[in-house]
Amino acid sequence: TGVTYDHRALVIDGXXXVLVSGSIHYPRAASSWYAVET
């Protein structure tokens, strides 16, 4: 058991897992992308 990594993914307990993450910078994004109608 353990966590290691190779050139493509994390390897958790022998199974490859790919983590995908991101963020949005609201001041740089068009307001229509995140506008909420009330």
From Swiss-Prot:
Keywords, in A-Z order: Glycoprotein, Glycosidase, Hydrolase
Protein name as it appears in the record: Beta-galactosidase
Misc note: There are three forms of the large subunit which have the same sequence but differ in charge. There are four forms of the small subunit which have the same sequence but differ in charge.
Role summary: Involved in cell wall degradation. Degrades polysaccharides containing beta-(1-->4)-linked galactans, acting as an exo-(1-->4)-beta-D-galactanase.
Catalysed conversion reaction: Hydrolysis of terminal non-reducing beta-D-galactose residues in beta-D-galactosides
PTM characteristics: The small subunit is N-glycosylated.
Organism: Hordeum vulgare
The EC number(s) this enzyme carries: 3.2.1.23
Enzyme class: hydrolase
